[in-house]
């Protein structure tokens, strides 16, 4: 592995640590959540469409997503390792026989449809994706429970300290009254 490939692998690993992309291929309907900056405000915008191509390799890998917006075809090219991509969700798997689906540009209506893939590979990928999502939800739920328990313990300790201080104050007042 030469130095360039090594640096690219390190950068890709750094980005993968922040967010993981599901395995998807041309023909799949994907929802790409992109960070959009408008003025001084940043928000996340969902862009849903059919992945019609994947090109490049390493850090320069791109994928093209096509959607029909108000009757007009719109294509957008996303770099896979872009920091502006927050997440990519696979909505449905498509069954195609080509790597580049540029022929969809000339088609409208039913002829532009892509049949859903219900094969073993698609099922396995969907199950793996669902398991990853469920695992992530369980992790988040566990963090919430741990935070709630820590808050309850902190509150109980504060109440105990408050009760102890009140008892000491009452004892001091009682000794002063004698």
From Swiss-Prot:
GO BP of this protein: translation
Pfam name, any one: Ribosomal_L19
UniProt KW keywords: Ribonucleoprotein, Ribosomal protein
GO CC annotation: cytosolic large ribosomal subunit
Entry-linked SUPFAM superfamilies: Translation proteins SH3-like domain
Transmembrane stretches, start-end: none
GO molecular function: structural constituent of ribosome
Coiled-coil regions listed: none
Function: This protein is located at the 30S-50S ribosomal subunit interface and may play a role in the structure and function of the aminoacyl-tRNA binding site.
Family: Belongs to the bacterial ribosomal protein bL19 family.
Name of the protein: Large ribosomal subunit protein bL19
Source organism phylogeny: Bacteria, Pseudomonadati, Pseudomonadota, Alphaproteobacteria, Hyphomicrobiales
UniProt gene name: rplS
């Amino acid at each position: 592995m030469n130095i360039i490939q090594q640096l690219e692998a390190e950068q890709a690993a750094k980005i993968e640590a922040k967010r993981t992309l599901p395995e998807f291929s041309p023909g799949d309907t994907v929802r790409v959540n992109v960070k959009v900056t408008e003025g001084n405000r940043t928000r996340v915008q969902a862009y849903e469409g059919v992945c019609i191509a994947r090109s490049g390799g390493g850090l320069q890998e791109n994928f093209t997503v096509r959607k029909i917006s108000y009757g007009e075809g719109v294509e957008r090219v996303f770099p896979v390792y872009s920091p502006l991509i927050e997440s990519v969700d696979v909505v449905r798997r498509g069954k195609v026989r080509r790597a580049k689906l540029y022929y969809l540009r000339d088609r409208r209506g039913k002829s532009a449809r892509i049949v859903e893939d219900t094969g073993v590979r698609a099922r396995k990928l969907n199950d793996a994706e669902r398991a990853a999502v469920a695992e992530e939800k369980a992790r988040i739920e566990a963090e919430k429970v741990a935070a709630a328990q820590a808050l309850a313990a902190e509150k109980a300790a504060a109440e105990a300290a408050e009760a102890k201080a009140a008892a000491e104050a009452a004892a001091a007042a009682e000794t002063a009254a004698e």
